[in-house]
Amino acid sequence: MVLTENLKENDINEALSMTGVIHLKDKNLGDLSGGEFQRVLLARAISKKPDLLVLDEPVQGVDFTGEIALYELIKKISDELNCGILLISHDLHTVMSATDHVVCLNGHVCCSGSPIEGAKNNEYKVLFGEQASQILTRYKHSHDHIHTSEGEIKKN
């Protein structure tokens, strides 16, 4: 894939810095680890400050700790650049717990909507089982507080 226009050095450095790989700027891609490679690809994708970032299996070839860091980075980039994320993934845990809208494909669109709506869909239940729809779906809170990922409770 070739970028269609030249980028300014400043834009390249900013994207590499944002993804934490500015120190790898002059390295050969073949010398990078899986996580480094994915971060460089992510830097390339954000270098033009897109409105929509399309990511196909963005944590492929990355260890578990690196996966967490990459997903946190993707969220940070989405927030800072104010861009939407279209995430293609087979990682059902991430898809169902960290997304706003899900489209489940199995040769056709089985279901779409919020993760909670998707998990209630009969085709979803047939594909992944009743247990998956209960375990993998984010619990929707209707109280005056939220639970943070650090386990803290914060008032709304």
Functional labels for PLM-detected ranges:
Residues L53-E57:
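Catalytic Walker B motif of ABC-type/P-loop ATPase nucleotide-binding domains
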Residues F128-N156:
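ABC ATPase nucleotide-binding domains
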Residues G107-E117:
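Conserved switch/coupling elements of ABC/ABC-like ATPase nucleotide-binding domains
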Residues S89-H90:
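H-loop/switch region of ABC-family ATPase nucleotide-binding domains
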Residues N28-L32, E36:
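Conserved ABC ATPase signature
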